[in-house]
């Protein structure tokens, strides 16, 4: 379903390993958003729904309120965040919805299938070649009020499994970011490597550091990419969630 080495399948594997260990298969409900993450709901033999562009978190939150015993997980990507401005995540955090939101950060903010998705603050047109991040995802999640925040890469499926066990056991909103650059996006520049080489390259740029302040986790900053579970920034509030 997904390209070899794509982090979506690995994140899904980590989720099902967590669910199997917890024995909550019958309670699980999975929602998926736009793009490649939208394929997730089509492939599962559990309660699942592909909610369409920009509606996955809101639909999952509504489902969870009506089905209080459900363990509800949402898979979204960068396009979903840009479509809503993260307003659905902010609203779920304010309402203390028991959701686990898994964000596949594929580092793409350009045209997809001929359609222009919402733009980053750094480009006038999505047709302009470039890769930029609109905001620091862990910091934005903390400012919105999420209780559990983590970031992993595809080489850390075991760590992500443990994080998801904690998230599925926690109350309120949990946000887990999977940094997995899209491999198809690099084919036009002839920079694509094999799956193992790609994941190893990303892993070599990574460092695991727990409880690091979320404001220091912007991927645009030089140095290692920090993975782990993170400490909240000072204070929280939806009005500041787009601080960069």
Regions found by a protein language model. Give the residues of each.
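Active-site diphosphate/adenylate-binding microenvironment
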Residues: 1-52
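Glycine-rich beta-alpha junction loops
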Residues: 34-36, 106-108, 156, 179-185, ...
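Thiamine diphosphate
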Residues: 34-109
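Short acidic, glycine/serine/threonine-rich loops at helix termini
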Residues: 41-44, 84-88, 111-116, 186-191, ...
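Conserved thiamine diphosphate
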Residues: 116-166
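ATP/pyrophosphate-binding catalytic subdomain of soluble kinases
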Residues: 148-186, 195
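Flexible, low-complexity linker and terminal segments
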Residues: 180-244
């Amino acid at each position: 379903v997904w390209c070899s080495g794509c982090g979506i399948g690995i994140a899904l594997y980590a989720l099902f390993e967590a669910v199997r260990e917890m024995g909550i298969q019958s309670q699980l409900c999975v929602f998926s958003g736009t793009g490649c993450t939208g394929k997730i709901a089509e492939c599962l033999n559990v309660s699942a729904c592909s909610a369409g562009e920009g509606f996955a978190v809101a639909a999952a939150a509504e489902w969870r309120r009506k089905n209080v015993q459900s363990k509800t997980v949402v898979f979204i990507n960068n396009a979903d965040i840009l479509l809503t401005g993260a307003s659905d995540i902010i609203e779920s955090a304010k309402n203390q919805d028991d959701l686990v939101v898994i964000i596949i950060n594929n580092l793409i903010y350009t045209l997809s299938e001929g359609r222009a998705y919402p733009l980053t603050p750094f480009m006038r047109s999505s047709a302009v070649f470039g890769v930029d991040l609109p905001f620091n995802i862990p910091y934005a999640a903390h400012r919105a009020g999420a209780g559990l925040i983590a970031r992993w890469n595809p080489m850390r499926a075991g760590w992500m499994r443990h994080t998801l066990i904690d998230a599925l056991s926690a109350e309120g909103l949990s946000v887990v970011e999977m940094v997995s650059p899209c491999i198809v996006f690099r084919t036009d520049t002839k920079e694509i490597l094999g799956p193992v080489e790609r994941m190893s390259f990303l892993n070599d740029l990574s460092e695991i550091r727990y409880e690091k302040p979320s404001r220091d986790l912007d991927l645009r900053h030089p140095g290692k990419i920090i993975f782990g579970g993170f400490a909240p920034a000072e204070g929280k509030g939806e009005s500041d969630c787009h601080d960069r």
